Structure formats: C-alpha cells, structure tokens
Amino acid sequence: METRKLSSCALAVRVALVLGGALSLPALAADPAPQPAAKATASKDTSDIERIEVTGIRASMKASVNTKRFSNSVVDAITSEDIGKFPDKNVAESLSRITGVSVTRDFGEGEKIAVRGTDPSQNRTLLNGSAVASADWFVLDNPSRAFNFTLLPSNLISSLEVYKSPQADIQEGSLGGTVYLKTFKPMQLDANTLKLSAEEQYSDNSEKWDPQLSGLYSWKNDDETFGFLISLTRQDRTLVREGKESLGFVRQTVDGKDYWAPRVIGDANFEQKRERKTGFAAIQWRPAERWDLNLNILNTKLDANNTNHNLYTFLNDNFNPADAVISGDHIVAGSADNATSQLYVIDRISYSKSKAYDFEGSYDADVFKVTMKAGFTEAEGGTSRDRHYQFSRVMDHVTFDGLNHTDYVDASNTESRDQLLARPFDWMQEGARTMKDEERYGGFDFELPVSHGIFTDIKAGVYYRDHDKSQRQTGTRFHWYKDDQLNGAWGDVLPGQTNWASGVLGQYSLSDFVGGDSTANYPLLDTGKAAAIAYPDAAFASPTATFLFLADTWKVNEKIYSAYTKGNFQGEGFRGDVGVRFVKTEVRSSGYLWDGDATAAAISLLDGYSLLADAVDPSAGGDWNVRQETAKHSYDDILPNLNLVFDLTDDTLLRFSAARVMSRPDYVDIAYHESLNIPTRSGQRGNPNLDPTRANQYDIAYEWYFSDTGMLSGTFFYKDIEGLVKYQNVDAQAYDEQAGENVLVNVTQPINGAGSEVKGVELSYQQEFGNFGILANYTYTDANAKEERDPVTSPGSGLTLGTSKHMANLTGYYENDWLSARLAYNYRTHYYDGISEYGSEVFTDNYGQLDGRIGIKVMENLELTAEAVNITDEDIEQYHIDKSAPSKKYSNGRRFYVGLNYSF
C-alpha cells in the first residue's frame, strides 16, 4: 500500500475543526500510599506527605515515587497525570511503561498485559478492588481470564498500581502480579469540576480521520457529605492491518530427511471500524461522620465490525524436493505442484461490552473499622454474524520464498484478472459466536488498631465470588458448489448440507460480488452485495438453516470462598505486613462430547437452548451425535505472604518478600468441550479436572530516593512454578458419519505439567534536570520450563508463553508553564506466542515502539495537544522456531492525534 503523508495543511484544518476539550482529568488530591484497604506505615515521620497536588509531570512523578516508597509490598504506580501526558488511549499502553510488564498489540493498540514472565491469563486486573468482567471481540480469541484493556479508556483512571508481591487482603489469582486501578471519587475533586476533550485521530494505513470525545463533571455539596461524578467517552478508529502470513509449518521429507515446511501462505487485508463508548458514574455519600458509602457504575461497549480478505496458497504435500532451499531445519523456499489457491473473505459483526456495579460502604469507629463490599459485573463479546465466502482454483505449479508466494492471479498460471472474476462461487457459511462472563461478589473486612509488640493493626475478612463463563456458537451448514477442477471431494454435497433455500448460488461468479476499486492485485468483495446474493432472508426460513455447534458450546461455573488475616507491623528501622489467605474453589463444567452410539436419544441443552432432533441423529442427516456432560472439581489453597521493609538510611531502603501464589487455569482449558475433525482423525477437548498453577516466589529490592521525584531501584525476583498447563495427545472414539462406524481420533487435551522456574532483575531510574527529566527502566527475565524441548511431537514443550528476556523503557520530557512534551520508547525482545492454526510454534520477534506527545497551554484553562503513536511505523513480525522461517508480518501503521482540552 502506498504510504500517504499527513500534510501540514490537512493538520492545520483538523486542528481548526476541533472544538471543546479537556486533558487528563483534574488537578486532584491523591493518597501518597494508595494500598487497597490497607494503611501504609513508615518508620520515619510522614506527616508532611499527606496530599499531593497533581498539576504537572513532576508532581505526578512525586506521587508515583511516594506510592512505591511507602508501600509495604513491591509496587509500581502511575498517576493520572502520567496517563494523561502519555499518548495512551487505554490503560494497557500505560502499564507497558512499568518494569516487568509487557503488552500485546496485535492490532496496533494495547489489549492484554503480562507480568514477570507469565501469561496474560495468569494476572488479574481489579477496578477499585473488584473484578470487571470482560469478553473478546476477535473470533480467534478463546475465552480466558485475561482482561481486555481495549474496553477501558485511560481517562477514567486516577491511579494504577501493579502489586508484584501480594498482600493477604488483595484477591488471589495472580501468578505474576495484580493490576489495581482506581477511579476518581467526587470528594477528591472540587465542586463543579468540568473536563472536556475533543480530538481527531488520523490513521495512516486507513487514511481516515476519526473523532475522540470525552467529558467529566463532578459535584459535591458544601458540607462534603454527598457528591456525584459522571464521565462519558467516545473513541472511534478506522483500522487497516496489512499482512503476509503462513498459517503453520508441517514436516516434509527431502532426500530422506524431515524438515519444517510452510503449509499455507497468504496475503491478508484486515479492515475494521472501531467505536468505543464508555459511561462511568460514581456516587459518594457520607450520611454521618463515620460512614462513607460509594457506588460505582461502569458501562462500556466496543463495536468492532471487520472484514478480512485472504489470498491463500495451500502448498499441500506436493513439494518438489529438487527446488527446496534449506536453512537449518526449515525449507524456506521452493515449489509445489497441484496446489490450491483461494480468495477467502470473512465479514464479521463483532463487539465486546461490559457492565459493572460496585458498592462499598465503610464505618470507622476509630477503635475499629468495618468495610462491606458487594457487586455484579457482566460482559458479552464475540461475533453476532460471521460470514465466509470462498473462491478456489487448482494451480499447476507454484513457488514460494519466505512469505512471498505465487498467488491466485499470477500470470504464469494462465488466469488473468478477468478470468478470475469469472470463477464460480465455491462455498459459503454463516456463523455466530457469543462469549459471556458474569460475576456476583460480596465480602466484609474488619480492621482493628492494636499496640501489641510490633503490630500496629490487624485486619481480617471474608469474600465470596460466583463466576460464570460460557460460550455459544451457532452456524449454517457448509454449502459447497460443484467445480470440476476441485476433484469431487470439495464439490460433492455431504449429508446434512442440503435444502439451503438459495440453492442456485452455483450460477454466480466472483464478478457478481465485487465492488469498488482495489489497490491490491486481487479484487475486494462488496460485502453488502455478496450478502444480498448469498444470504437472502428466504434462506433462513428453513428451520434447519441454522443450528448450534455443540462442540463449541459450553459453560463453566466457579464458586470461590476466601478468608484472610493480615497484620501490619512497625519497629525501629523496619516495617511490613504478614498474612495468610485461605481459598476454596468449586468448579462445575458443562458441555457436549461426541457419543459412539449412533442411535443416541435427543439431548437437553444448556441455558434453555433448543435443538432439532435431526441435528444429533446421523441417520436423519444430522451432523453430530453428542451427549451432554457435567463435571465437578474442587481444590483448596493456603497462601501465606510476608512483606518486610528495612530503612537503611533516610533515603535508602531494602525490601524482602516471600509468598505462595496461585493462578486458576484458563476457562477454555477446563470447559467440557470436544471438537473433532473426523477426516483427519484429530481434535481438541478440555479438561475440567485441571488444578491451578501454583508458585513460591521471593523478591529482594534496593531503593534509593535521592529527591522528591528522583529514584534509583533494583529488584531481584524468583518464582518456582508448579503445575503449568501443557498439552498431551490421547486416543478417543468417535462416530464417522460417512463410513458409518466408530473410529479412533487423536485428541489434544490440557494437563498439569511439571512447571517452570522464572528469575529476573528489574532496574528503574528517574530524575529531573531543571525543566527536563528522564525515566528509564530495564527488565531481565530468565524463564525455563521443567520439561524437555520437543517441538515436533509436543509443540510448545520446554517454553514459557509470552516471556521476553529483555524489556526496556526510556522516556524524556520537558515542561514549563506553557509547554509540556514527552517522547517515550518501549522495547521487548522476542517471545514464544503460542501454537499456530496447524499446530506449530509461533514466536513474535523483537519489537520497539516510539510514541510522543506535546501540549501547549494557549489559555489558562485551554490546552492544544498533538500526539503520535508508533512514530517509526514498526511492523509486528513472527517466525517459526528460528528467524529463517518467517511466519507472519503485520503493518498496523501510525496514528496521529490533534485536540483541545478544556478544564473548569
């Protein structure tokens, strides 16, 4: 795609059109040691650090430094001014600037985070101390425990902290660290605080402008006994991701030796329109002097409709050994005969939405304090409509070199663009996938000041969580249309694939679906025109047109009971806390498994879904023969922890922490589901009897605070992890409809493996030099799985997911009375990223991103801003085992923002 540069004229016009605005919400008072439901104590007098006015970068740095310094735990923090000054439109981007925290940016925007060499699903995110349900919009994302940060705009957050060593009063479930987000409270802000922001975003890949709007209003009465806050945000983005990809590697024999060879190579054009709307409301009421009642309501939705055009070449097993170019253990270039080429288009209506209702009430009687917490959160995401279109042809001879390949319209294959347009329609299918996440929770905390020995207060509490995670997948049957070149197997209609109302689809060609111009060497579909032809309303009048994919429909319920006790202590030159958390988890997993009995009776369905009897009876033309199953499992955990801080001097301290932590397995792994591919005799299924991954962890840290905003720190961390989830192959019996008999299928299922050992070092430095300043950090992580490496028979063995050995951040800034500027660079080295579509390993290569922001104060309450994301236009690149075998390369492009911010 030709890169079009943003002209200064266009930029000036956009700035002139932007109206209203407010920056990162308010100058506010912040607690210098914001530990959830805990009082941080220090052995030195801290009475002079009660409240900090966050009015600029330096004040923000001071607040973050104090949070870290006076916490008993190993904590890193960012305040509201940090988030507002960075070019961060969601919280994940802000978190990526903390030591030990990495972020995924599959579509050019931070989505999920990981801490200290762990998987994103092994780290919890809490909003005001409670979970927020989340779901993914992307069809290839499995329901997991990882929080989707694309739902949460950063202007909602007053501060964030990453707890790398646990406290007994913080919810369990994090193996790497717990992200603790705090929103603004009405009593924090001045009465009638108003913040407005209006921006325009330009994406250079899509060459589109999109609006970014937000506003916040906060009020409280003169007595400060009642207040409310309302925040509204809308952020649009037109996304184009251009890519080349290999969907996996398989073993091929050349001259009697096996090598890894690409299975499918393709070009991908992904287009998406994102529209995120978020509403947040907070009510704070103090009905009496000792009471404090808070209600927070969050409602956020992301519409993420997208279309993906793929031009694939299936090399199949027809490699020409004489043409193979070998590099190490890979065939990196060569040719194949009788390959298949496809123009494959997917058009999706995708979304993700979350709601959270959180209530907290406290009564402080001086001699004791009681806090009650209760709430409900729910989320839903996925694709409400997922339409597939395919046009195929057989190619006599193709060549490939890395991710370059002979494509559908290559002239050497004697098919011109006009001939391509005359190709008949191959097949189509429509589906929908809905993922739901719900949690109901409640608990009590009791805090008692004491003066027994070194202890200053004792805290205890109980907590209950009832969590549901489910997935439902529906679809039409596959509909194939005869093409003599496709050798029968693809042209024949199988049982259960008849009676589609639009049975004349075979008369259409690609030219009937094409609309508009394309800069690519192949035409793009007009999806509206294609839908009118392939999916007329009459097609769905047939009662058998749509059915439930039982193998991908399941539900998991967890009931979690926890209790804890914790003591804060302080002595001459030391302080800390010690505690223990007791947790019981009860799991109930329901789903559907294949049944070897071809005459099995009809089944009942989860959550009241209905299903026609012929859908489960092969003799009636049904596709499956299944049975519903429910499994129960439970486990208990005792999680002690110790945080100890020694004040070496007035400016230096030494930390030590030790703890037992746990992380529950991903929902898709414990779901009772089974997905089988009978022709290939392969499949996958879940394992409801998985136990959590557990670890013993230790931290030692040295910290030097040489000024109010200056700090130098070093931390060594170690985790001995046990029970990491791995995958094994087992034989299972299934019914083959075409053969009319039971067959053995090789099924991959998760089990608890040996574990891993993670150790590393975090270094952090920040200092100001007059109006200039610098923030820098570096993380080294060495993660080793406790099993042998075998990428051929056990892909992923001996590897730890998502772990980069080296990560670094460097930020420079300048600030005076009217100008504020920052330039921030984030870097991480390669890491193991999971298993490909064909079961081979995928690694993501080194990646660095440069972002910047400038703010100019044009009036007392008005600021003009300009921001840039991914300034150097970096691509995301992946490979298989070694870099000689590229797997994927994606360009998300750069983004630019111009805007006005107004505060009153």
Locate each region found by the language model.
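C-terminal beta-signal and adjacent terminal beta-strands/loops
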Residues: 827-834, 855-904
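Outer-membrane beta-barrel signature, preferentially recognizing the C-terminal barrel domain
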Residues: 346-348, 352-354, 552, 556-559, ...
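N-terminal periplasmic "start-of-domain" segments of outer-membrane beta-barrel proteins
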Residues: 53-86, 112, 123, 135-137, ...
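Outer-membrane beta-barrel translocator/receptor signature
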Residues: 139-146, 155-162, 169-252, 260-263, ...
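Extracytoplasmic beta-strand/coil segments of soluble accessory domains associated
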Residues: 92-134, 164
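Solvent-exposed loop segments that connect transmembrane elements
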Residues: 242-267, 307-345, 390-427, 480-495, ...
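Outer-membrane beta-barrel transmembrane strands
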Residues: 183, 198-201, 209-220, 267-308, ...
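Gram-negative outer-membrane beta-barrel transporters
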Residues: 717-721, 725, 730-836, 872
